[in-house]
From Swiss-Prot:
It catalyses: a 3-oxo acid + succinyl-CoA = a 3-oxoacyl-CoA + succinate. One of its GO terms (biological process) is ketone body catabolic process. The active site is at 341 (5-glutamyl coenzyme a thioester intermediate). It comes from the Eukaryota. Belongs to the 3-oxoacid CoA-transferase family. This is Succinyl-CoA:3-ketoacid coenzyme A transferase 2, mitochondrial. Homodimer. It is an enzyme of class 2 (transferase).
């Protein structure tokens, strides 16, 4: 305590301008730096900022889709013509912008990401054997990056247990003639408190290229809205962190409590010359078209049944499509806190045209709004909420569901590569109720509810309820399905004919419920 009192008294006296520090007597801190020397170096030329990124380097590139990507630093990498990069990114965006430009220029050898999405260039290079692709669950990727920055070499997670992530064998590289050349390795598995967890290793990079909103001249950085995403953890997990921002302000412009990334993590800063801030999925609030076809009628039926799963005060994560549309039917008297994996709690409706903001998107890359009381955070925090069981409900689509609740929705090997995104994380917590919404059969009338999934799993024995346009099933992870509700006009025999496994019929079977329009 005496030392702390002495320290406070010395700091209270101040330091003469130009002084190099204060020497304290033995046993106390030796000096207090007051020189203007800072860790962060400021640049005017983005090419100069990245010119020492060499061939074969590992580079983290911040952003989520196109939101919060370092546009100017990516353009600078194109000009340096560096090649054989190993890129770590949440996903690969689109073909003609952002990370897609590096792929088009053949500068990337390997990508570690969670989602390919609609980037057909990435998918085609991967399937042709021209690109290595290590697909990693989004929350696991965020935590691997966070661990790398925190000096934690590895950690255990429930995400991916019972899937190719744990078992190994996920395709990383194909030969030009379509054969597997490189596959993922199995993970070590341990059991804690009766649940299974797999060992994941931390990631560090040679460089991190990050997009902030503002930086002060000390190198402290703040981000805008949902553009924190992977930018924040990546700042902390590279040997050299280069940040581009829209504005540079004087030291003291940010209240200390408002700084998102302290300057200890920042090595280089530049003010971006220009920003396109392209929006991947511009989505505007509009009245629904009342002219719905047969398929839309089926979707509406699922949506209106799914809306009955919401409870007042719950925290929920909704996948794109039917799950998100179900939120339109939440009663005005009910409060449901909607969570988005890219770092939002308190999602509101889609924006009007004058509310559109490129820095405010959901996990489906759609423009959104945030309700009063909503908040933003980085991707590692977002998935801590998910893995930690703080989300009561997750609702998502599926390609296949088994009678024991196995879920497949992320890949058709050799044909369709989307990536798991955050789905594996969302279904990994034992505390979260998982509801699947989907059409009962494929377009060729093949059942999607099956004895056993034939596609790679997203989660093992993780689904609690299935809602289709024909029926509602409850899933018992050690027994068969139970038919709970049936659409009017259909019989149990109709459901048996369109379902690929046996199921029990509830003694309290009732007509399929619908929320009031």
């Amino acid at each position: 305590m005496a030392a702390l009192r002495l320290l406070a008294s010395v700091l209270g006296r101040g330091v003469p301008a130009g002084g190099s520090g204060l020497a304290l007597s033995q046993g106390c801190a030796r000096c207090f730096a007051t020189s203007p020397r800072l860790r962060a170096k400021f640049y005017a030329d983005p090419v100069e900022m990245v010119k020492d990124i060499s061939d074969g380097a590992t580079v983290m590139i911040g952003g989520f889709g196109l939101c919060g990507i370092p546009e100017n630093l990516i353009a600078a990498l194109l000009r340096t013509r560096v090649k054989d990069l190993q890129v770590v990114s949440s996903n690969v965006g689109v073909e003609d912008f952002g990370l897609g430009l590096l792929l088009a220029a053949r500068q990337v050898r390997r990508i570690v990401c969670s989602y390919v999405g609609e980037n057909t260039l990435c998918e085609s290079q991967y399937l042709a054997g021209e690109l290595e692709l290590e697909l990693t669950p989004q929350g696991t990727l965020a935590e691997r990056i966070r661990a790398g920055g925190a000096g934690v070499p590895a950690f255990y997670t429930p995400t991916g247990y019972g899937t190719l992530v744990q078992e190994g064998g996920a395709p990383i590289r194909y030969t030009p003639d379509g054969h597997l050349a490189l596959m993922s390795q199995p993970r070590e598995v341990r059991e804690f408190n009766g649940d299974h967890f797999l060992l994941e290793r931390a990631i560090r990079a040679d460089f991190a290229l990050v997009k902030g909103w503002k930086a002060d001249r000390a190198g402290n950085v703040v981000f805008r809205r949902s553009a924190r995403n992977f930018n924040v953890p990546m700042c902390k997990a590279a040997d050299v962190t280069a940040v581009e921002v829209e504005e540079i302000v004087e030291v003291g412009a940010f209240p200390p409590e408002d700084i998102h990334v302290p300057n200890i993590y920042v090595d280089r800063v530049i003010k971006g010359q220009k920003y396109e801030k392209r929006i991947e999925r511009l989505t505007i609030l509009k009245e629904e078209d009342g002219d719905a076809g047969k398929e839309e009628d089926a979707r509406t039926r699922i949506i209106r049944r799914a809306a009955l799963e919401f409870e007042d005060g719950m925290y929920a994560n909704l996948g794109i499509g039917i799950p998100l549309l179900a939120s339109n039917f939440i009663s005005p008297s009910m409060t449901v806190h909607l969570h988005s994996e890219n770092g939002i709690l308190g999602l509101g409706p889609f924006p009007t045209e004058d509310e559109v903001d490129a820095d405010l998107i959901n996990a489906g890359k759609q423009t959104v709004t945030v309700l009063p009381g909503g908040c933003f955070f980085a991707s590692d925090d977002s998935f801590a909420m998910i893995r930690g069981g703080h989300i009561q409900l997750t609702m998502l689509g599926a390609m296949q569901v088994s009678k024991y609740g196995d879920l497949a929705n992320w890949m058709i090997p050799g044909k369709k590569v989307k990536g798991m995104g955050g789905a594996m994380d969302l279904v990994s917590s034992q505390k979260t109720r998982v509801v699947v919404t989907m059409q009962h059969c494929t377009k060729d009338n093949t059942p999607k509810i099956m004895e056993k999934c034939t596609m790679p799993l997203t989660g093992k024995r993780c689904v609690d309820r299935i809602i289709t346009e024909k029926a509602v099933f409850d899933v018992h992870r050690k027994k068969e399905l139970t038919l709970r509700e049936l659409w009017e006009g259909l019989t149990v025999d109709d459901i048996k004919k369109s379902t690929g496994c046996a199921f029990a019929v509830s003694p309290n079977l009732r007509p399929m419920q619908q929320v009031a329009p």
